[in-house]
Regions:
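Gram-negative outer-membrane beta-barrel transporters
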Residues: 133-136, 185-187, 297-301, 319-399, ...
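Surface-exposed extracellular loop regions of Gram-negative outer-membrane beta-barrel proteins
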Residues: 50, 54, 147-158, 201-212, ...
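C-terminal beta-signal and adjacent terminal beta-strands/loops
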Residues: 298-303, 340-341, 345, 395-397, ...
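Repeated loop/turn-to-beta-strand initiation elements of outer-membrane beta-barrel proteins
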Residues: 30-33, 91-94, 136-139, 188-191, ...
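Outer-membrane beta-barrel signature, preferentially recognizing the C-terminal barrel domain
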Residues: 58-84, 167-175, 218-228, 232, ...
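Flexible loop and strand-edge segments within Gram-negative outer membrane beta-barrel domains
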Residues: 6-13, 31-87, 94, 102-121, ...
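Signature of Gram-negative outer-membrane beta-barrel scaffolds
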Residues: 143-238
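Outer-membrane beta-barrel proteins
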Residues: 4-27, 66-78, 111-125, 167-170, ...
Length: 471
């Protein structure tokens, strides 16, 4: 059971979150069963909106005036449950997973037409797999099915009051997939290969109200399918040192929320296409009792990347379009060192280029820093846990035209937790200090926002008391 409540750093940014999580596991002779249940309730989370840099310099804690006028906020209620069942057979181990979630969402956006949103989402699915291994070969085959149904309505937002309905549509996303994985293992090397095939069916039943005349019915349906192969090689240099190389191809369909954000009005945005990516990574890793680290170089080539943008008169609402081709080329370093009694140090560093080309125009992808660094110290003594982290994020561009640059920042947080048990009830009491050095930075950049309202200033130094219980 948990509850989070805050007045927010900025005006019009308070929120309340409540959640209940239940987990139960049972073991039988050849069967393992796990059941999870999560209920989440956020009655309100106000949105202060994005600011121009001039407004940030004037008062970084202020909210955008239109967000206050239209009472921009959202409320969410979500129920999520799942059942995992694993058992052994003569031909291998069967793993199954069945899940369901329901989400009720109400959102108020800072404009009139369509600015009051009601969404009810049902999401369900199942996955089944069979795996086995011999002395030198491992394999897995499986299938998955998913179904998402969104009942989406939009109304006029009359300065925080619900107005007339302007959109009413039922959206559906169905997916059926099959996959196979194999690994051929020898003492010095391992060859891994995989193949997945997915079929997607996306549809929309749109009831668009024709004011003063009648009701108009619009139907949209589209099928998509694709193969996603992968291939990898791991070569052992010694007992704890490995070289590895991987190739993979994947594609991603637009989500229902992205498709329904149609700049031409109701219905789906038929100009929005799936994005596809192919990539390589080459790396080295070493593991020992006290030190482990990995160094990876990567290259990803993406076609029809889906990016967000805003339109005049609909500021605060995300629209989406495909952005030609993009390339990601870089390197990542991760390391973990066991200090013994003083704890554990974890560190990571990324340096990369994220570039795009669209209709003869090229530049850096908006909203992605070229480099970042993080350092974390974990210390534990009896029931006391201490976590100190430091993160550096390089500068980035806020727009695809690369005209507005957001400065870099250095952020540090500290968390102290103590666990107390009382009559079978476990209490985790914590003190968190966020932004320890009082850094002025932005916790979100609204890439390609209209009117240069890119900036959502983050809180300065903040003290948080938390109490968590489980039983």
């Amino acid at each position: 059971v948990s509850q989070q409540e805050s007045d927010g750093y900025r005006d019009h940014s308070s929120y309340l979150n409540k959640s209940l999580f239940f987990k139960h596991a049972r073991e039988f002779q050849n069967i393992n069963l796990k059941f999870n249940l999560l209920y989440f309730d956020s009655p309100y989370a106000f949105d202060p909106g994005g600011l121009t840099i001039e407004l940030v310099d004037e008062n970084r804690s202020q909210a955008r005036d239109r967000n206050v006028l239209y009472n921009s906020q959202e409320s969410v209620k979500q129920l999520q449950t799942g059942l995992v069942l694993n058992w052994n057979t003569k031909i291998g181990q069967v793993n199954s997973n069945i899940y369901y979630s329901n989400r009720d969402f109400i959102g108020l956006l800072p404009f009139t037409y369509g600015g009051y949103v009601e969404l009810n989402r049902d999401f369900s699915g199942a996955e089944f797999s069979l795996k086995n291994r011999s002395e030198s070969f491992e394999w897995m085959i499986g299938t998955s099915i998913q179904n998402q149904a969104d009942d989406r309505k939009r109304f006029e937002n009359n300065e925080g009051e619900k107005g007339v309905k302007v959109l009413d549509q039922i959206e559906s996303f169905k997916s059926l997939g099959a996959f196979a994985l194999g690994s051929f293992n020898k003492s010095k090397y391992s060859i891994q290969a995989g193949l997945r095939y997915d079929i997607h069916e996306i549809s929309s039943d749109d009831y668009m109200l024709d004011i003063g005349i009648d009701q108009q019915y619009i139907d949209y349906s589209k099928s998509m399918s694709a193969f996603s192969p992968s291939l990898g090689l791991v070569y052992s240099l010694s007992k704890n040192r490995e070289l590895y190389i991987n190739y993979g191809y994947a594609y991603e369909t637009p989500s229902l929320s992205e498709l329904s954000a149609n700049p031409n009005g109701t219905g789906f945005n038929e100009n929005l296409s799936p994005m596809s990516s192919s990539g390589f990574d080459l790396g080295f890793r070493k593991q020992s009792q006290d030190l482990s680290y990995s160094l990876t170089a990567f290259y990803i080539d993406t076609k029809d990347e889906i990016v967000r943008y805003e339109l005049e008169g609909f500021e605060g609402m995300n629209f989406y379009r495909n952005l030609g081709t993009s390339k990601r080329l870089g390197a990542e370093l991760e390391a973990s060192y066991n200090l013994g009694k003083p704890g554990v140090l974890n560190a990571s560093y990324t340096q990369a280029k994220y570039e795009f080309e669209n209709q003869g125009i090229s530049g850096d992808l908006a909203g992605i820093p070229k480099s970042n660094f993080s350092l974390e110290w974990l210390y534990a003594y009896k029931n006391l846990d201490l976590n100190l982290d430091l993160k550096y994020v390089n500068s980035l561009f806020a727009d695809n035209n690369n005209e507005v640059k957001v400065p870099s920042y250095l952020l540090s947080n500290i968390a102290l937790k103590n666990k107390v048990n009382f009559k079978g009830v476990s209490l985790d009491i914590g003190l968190h200090i966020r932004n320890l050095f009082d850094e002025k930075y932005y916790d979100n950049i609204r890439a390609n926002a209209f009117g240069n309202r890119f900036y959502e200033p983050a809180s300065l130094r903040q003290f948080i008391l938390s109490i968590k219980t489980s039983f």
